[in-house]
Swiss-Prot record:
Topological relation to the membrane, as annotated: Peripheral membrane protein
Chain's gene name: SEC16B
Protein name according to UniProt: Protein transport protein Sec16B
Bias (Low complexity): 223-236, 909-918
Chain residue ranges for the region called Required for endoplasmic reticulum localization: 34-224
Region entry Disordered, spans: 1-86, 163-236, 245-264, 711-733, 770-796, 834-1060
UniProt function note: Plays a role in the organization of the endoplasmic reticulum exit sites (ERES), also known as transitional endoplasmic reticulum (tER). Required for secretory cargo traffic from the endoplasmic reticulum to the Golgi apparatus. Involved in peroxisome biogenesis. Regulates the transport of peroxisomal biogenesis factors PEX3 and PEX16 from the ER to peroxisomes.
Keywords (A to Z) from UniProt: Endoplasmic reticulum, ER-Golgi transport, Golgi apparatus, Membrane, Peroxisome biogenesis, Phosphoprotein, Protein transport, Transport
Tissue specificity of this protein: Ubiquitous.
Phosphothreonine modified-residue sites: T858
Biased composition (Basic and acidic residues): 41-50, 875-890, 899-908
Length: 1060
């Protein structure tokens, strides 16, 4: 058997085989060629024959840089094995999802990019020739699920086929191997190294030697084989495990291959097809048309046949279309008559009566009510409804009367005394007759009244059922007695008696039947409703509540039609499907079920008839929430091919929407215009116009477009609806009461990123705290119309963000406050009580004036309390200091002091005063000074705000300004800062922020001078006759450096620290 070397496949582009620099690799010492094992990725190994005599260049190391080599033409006279069509067909497609030893696709020359990048040794990444039998070398059908991954590989296949088909020299010529497309034989490492097929160039001795040396491969070192194959240890073990007959000879390829096979195997589009067989595309048109394209193959020259079918004709026999055709809607046309509507309702009622379902009788009653309303032009009278209710109740039920069970006079459980026959009277000794006549009963009642025994007379009358005498006599007595007689009378009636329901309702109570009707032991619910509707007197609200209670009870029992009948009698308005608490949405359909079962065609038609009956008495009395269901009904008409009727519905809905004016919903308006735009060509008036006027729309559609444009323009011009939409997008609802209440005084201007979240000013953030002691309530109209810098500057989040204190940036005001929050923080620092500073007390003041935080600051947590936990004596000293200091100020400061007094009154009234700690519960465990100040800082009363890098320059500047005039009542601001933070001067951003809050009242107006003069120096407090406003807990932390604006600390050391 002749030995065949395995056929080589083209290597990956850009990774050509380089000559080897190792003289011992692939050769024997005697100069003869020895096979070098190569590894296939499924474990099959093959031998590459190399000849150092015929190789133009030595083979390069695998790790050397790969360079593109020029292709060498085959020598004249060399015979090359023809490439079958299977090579071209399956070379670019993965035809197996999972590996199978011996059946792997061995012709796969170009791997995916990921596979090419996995192996760095391109010269060793080749597959061996497949060991397939002759009957297996048949082109398989292409799998539609396995497509090529790289476009270049697909392009390579196409170019290769083109060369095979159009080569004038056949398949074995030299020109075929010198073409632009890569040849599997030429691009293989064997051809690049000058190696040819055995039997052509190698003598028989070499072939025999090679065959003799084959068993020696098994004795080769595993490490050498791994290094030569480029596989890792685990990959090599796997390849050895799944190796399938590496020494088996390859049978010769089929010589009967022809280019025709290549045409058959390669026929197919370059891109994946959506369908693999001819199919039928179908589309629905807006005019009730069905567009049908017959199956055809355009590649075979077959023309596609397009057919147009009418949906009205196709669905002519369907029940849904028949139900829609039988209804003469919309009911606002001039050609609609009441007789047609009444006939339609009577037919529906008759159909309901024939059915034996649970609610068939109630459904027929609802249709009969619509007939009555249509006959009476929408007006309802209680007696007419009662007559309708009692039509099916011809045989009145015999309600069993209850015997009296208790003596109502002494309220005991004794039965009524019954005189037996033949028993002598103990007083007179006479034997009374067995049955007393009515005359005798009345005579005895009169005799008791002769002697003034009223209660005995009432008892006798009630015992003998003289309820008229008893009720009249009790009505002339006290109210308790009358109520007692009434209760005795009603107790003799059956609980399910309609008289019981009427008497309970007349007594001012909701009857018991309202909560118990619908049950089997209570009987029919109709007589109870009839007696209520026919005898409406007194409080109409009580009667309405009783009827609604009956409807709710029936709805709870599943009697939807009966419940809706009661709701119509109580004049309950129609609601919405999404609001489950609404009683009524569509007549005869419960909105607690899914929408497809809820919005039935019959329910929509029934509700439209009720709307029509209302418009008979009151024109244009549309049901606003029902218009969307009419639009749904119009869409169903268009789907079933009834396009003209659907367009009439669009016109009717448009008339209802135009009558509502601005209250119409914009979404309904947009969807109505869309549907009308599709159906407008079915209007005969549009079709009858001239060809140049075909684009003109109906007048009602043009009016709808104008109304939509006005609504959109109004929404853009009005900022309040825009804010409501933004707040809804930011996670809140448009019914946000807080946002609506303060929308008039916010004065926002939308920034580019404004729609991402809802931002509020610091003043509004204070209002969001859950504490009952709300500090500084916002007064409506206190802001200018355009808003200040606090409103137009950096936005503040609606949610809470932990504060971050950056070291080396000054006080925490500069770190945490934005443009508009600087002045607000200064006012809080000026008017807060002891211990309410924003930074830790353990701070030092360097000589350069910059405050350095000595230890890391913990984020300030938001607290509902609005006061600090300082001592009572410290608070009193603060107030005394403020009063003494204010008396020694100049007249210019007198007005400022008046503002401060107003602010204090406002502060006390708002729960943020000096003694507000008195109304709160102090903490049991005293915390350190740093923790106390961190938890009681003014920022903790507000929602914490995140700091930004540019906010540090907008706060208080600690550099004093010598030319600034002093201001009074600012010692409270400098007291809690260790003496160093009391020099308040605002930067350029602070001046703008001060202008933004110029209209504030109360404590906000106190710092107006401070806000308007950003370079002001806070003066030291007056030391004569006044107590320094310092917290004694700060004495150990006071720095040694002195300053002109710092007060004398000697007086502060005189007072020991007060417990909290």
């Amino acid at each position: 058997m002749e030995l065949w070397a395995p056929q080589r496949l083209p290597q990956t582009r850009g990774k050509a085989t380089a000559p080897s620099k190792d003289p011992d690799r692939g050769f024997r010492r005697d100069g003869h060629h020895r096979p070098v094992p190569h590894s296939w990725h499924n474990g099959e190994r093959f031998h590459q024959w190399q000849d150092n005599r015929g190789s133009p260049q030595p083979q390069q190391e695998p790790r050397a840089d790969h360079q593109q080599q020029p292709h060498y033409a085959s020598r004249p006279g060399d015979w090359h094995q023809p490439v079958s069509g299977v090579d071209y067909y399956e070379g670019g497609y993965r035809n197996q999802l999972y590996s199978r030893p011996g059946y792997e696709n061995s012709y796969q020359s170009y791997q995916s990019p990921t596979m090419r990048e996995e192996y760095a040794y391109g010269s060793y990444y080749y597959h061996g020739h497949p060991q397939w039998l002759q009957e297996e070398r048949v082109p398989r059908q292409r799998s539609p699920y396995i497509w090529h991954e790289d476009y270049r590989e697909q392009k390579y296949l196409d170019e290769h086929h083109y060369e095979n088909q159009h080569s004038p020299f056949g398949t074995n010529s030299e020109t075929h191997f010198q073409s632009n497309s890569r040849n599997p034989c030429k691009d293989s490492p064997a051809s690049n190294s000058g190696q040819e097929w055995p039997g052509e160039l190698f003598p028989g001795s070499l072939l025999a030697e090679a065959q003799k040396n084959k068993p020696s491969l098994a004795s080769e070192s595993n490490l050498l084989q791994q290094r030569e194959s480029g596989l890792s240890s685990s990959s090599y073990e796997l390849s050895q495990y799944i190796r399938d007959a590496p020494e088996r000879d390859d049978p010769p390829a089929s010589a009967a291959w022809s280019p025709v096979q290549a045409d058959v195997s390669s026929a197919g589009p370059k891109a994946p097809m959506k369908f693999y067989i001819p199919h039928v595309p179908v589309s629905f048109g807006p005019g009730g048309q069905l567009v049908h394209v017959g199956p055809s193959s355009p590649t075979d020259g077959q023309a596609a046949l397009v057919e147009l079918h009418s949906m009205e004709v196709i669905l002519n026999d369907s029940e849904e279309q028949e139900e829609m055709r039988s209804f003469s809607g919309p009911l606002i046309r001039e050609d609609v008559h009441k007789v047609d509507i009444m006939t339609f309702c009577q037919q529906k009622a008759a159909q309901s009566c024939k059915s034996e379902t649970l609610g068939s009788r109630d459904s027929a009653l609802l249709w009969q009510l619509l007939v009555l309303l249509c006959r009476q032009n929408g007006s309802m009278v209680g007696s007419d409804i009662a007559e309708l209710l009692m039509q099916d109740c011809k045989k009145l039920e015999k309600y069993k009367r209850q015997p009296p069970v208790a003596n109502l006079i002494n309220l005991t459980d004794e039965d009524w005394p019954v005189l037996s026959s033949g028993t002598p009277n103990l007083l007179t000794g006479e034997i009374p007759p067995s049955v007393e006549t009515p005359a005798q009963i009345v005579e005895k009642f009169t005799r008791l009244l002769y002697y003034g025994r009223k209660k005995e007379a009432l008892e006798w009358a009630m015992k003998n059922h003289l309820w008229g005498h008893a009720l009249f006599l009790s009505s002339k007595m006290d109210p308790q007695t009358y109520s007692w007689v009434m209760s005795g009378f009603t107790s003799t009636l059956a609980l399910n008696d309609p008289l019981q329901t009427l008497f309970q309702l007349m007594s001012g109570r909701i009857p018991q039947a309202a909560t118990c009707c619908g049950e089997k032991q209570w009987g029919d619910w109709r007589p109870h409703l009839a007696v209520i509707l026919s005898n409406q007197a007194g409080d109409p609200e009580l009667y309405q509540r009783a009827i609604v209670a009956i409807g709710d009870t029936l709805a709870g029992k599943g009697l939807v039609e009966a419940a809706h009948f009661c709701y119509l009698m109580a004049h309950v308005p129609f609601g919405h499907y999404t609001v489950k608490t609404d009683h009524l949405v569509l007549l005869g359909s419960s909105h607690s079920q899914e929408f497809l079962k809820f919005a039935t065609t019959e329910a929509i038609q029934r509700t439209e008839i009720f709307e029509y009956c209302q418009m008979l008495g009151r024109p244009k009395s549309f049901i606003p929430s029902f218009q969307v269901y009419k639009l749904l009904y119009a869409s169903r008409l268009a789907d079933y091919g009834l396009v003209s009727q659907a367009l009439h519905y669009c016109e009717a809905i448009g008339a209802a929407v135009l009558s509502q004016g601005e209250s119409s919903h914009p979404v309904l308006l947009v969807e109505l215009i869309k549907l009308a735009e599709k159906l407008k060509l079915s209007d005969p008036l549009v079709l009858e116009r001239r060809s140049g006027d075909r684009d003109l729309e109906p007048d009602w559609l043009a009016q709808l477009r104008r109304q939509l444009e006005q609504k959109v323009a109004g929404d853009i011009g009005d900022p309040h609806p825009t804010r409501s939409d933004i707040s809804g997008a930011g996670g809140t609802t448009t019914e946000n009461t807080f946002y609506q209440d303060f929308s008039g005084c916010q004065g926002y201007s939308e920034a580019p990123g404004y729609r991402s979240a809802l931002w509020l000013t610091p003043e509004q953030t204070c209002l969001l705290q859950p504490s009952p002691q709300q500090p500084f309530p916002l007064q409506p109209g206190s802001y200018p119309a355009g808003g200040g810098a606090g409103q137009t500057g950096t936005p503040r989040p609606f949610y809470s963000v932990p504060e971050t204190h950056l070291p080396g940036t000054g006080s925490s005001v500069a770190v945490t406050e934005a443009t508009g929050g600087t002045v607000w923080e200064e006012m809080l620092q000026t008017h807060l009580g002891p211990g309410e500073n924003t930074v830790s007390q353990e701070t030092s003041q360097p000589p350069d004036g910059q405050e350095v935080i000595s230890k890391p600051q913990t984020p300030l947590a938001a607290r509902p309390r609005s006061i600090s936990e300082s001592s009572a004596s410290s608070a009193k000293e603060d107030e005394k200091e403020s009063s003494d200091e204010a008396d020694k100020n100049s007249p210019r400061n007198t007005a400022q002091r008046g503002k401060l007094g107003d602010g204090k009154e406002h502060t006390k009234s708002s729960g943020f005063g000096w003694f507000s700690w008195f109304r709160s519960k102090p903490t049991k465990n005293a915390s350190p000074a740093g923790d106390e100040d961190s938890s009681d800082s003014p920022d903790s009363e507000e929602t914490p705000r995140a700091s930004s890098p540019h906010q540090a320059g907008l706060g208080l500047s600690l550099t004093p300004s010598p030319e600034s005039p002093p201001l009074p009542d600012v010692s409270a601001f400098s007291r809690g800062r260790g003496g160093g933070e009391g020099r308040g001067s605002a930067s350029s951003g602070g001046a703008a922020a001060g202008a933004g809050v110029g209209g504030l009242s109360g404590p906000e107006s106190v710092s107006f001078e401070l806000c308007s003069n950003p370079g002001v120096l806070l003066p030291p407090p007056a030391l004569k006759g006044a107590v320094p406003l310092y917290n004694p807990s700060q004495v150990p932390q006071l720095p040694t450096a002195t300053s002109l604006n710092r007060p004398n600390r000697l007086a502060q050391r005189r007072y020991p620290t007060q417990p909290c």
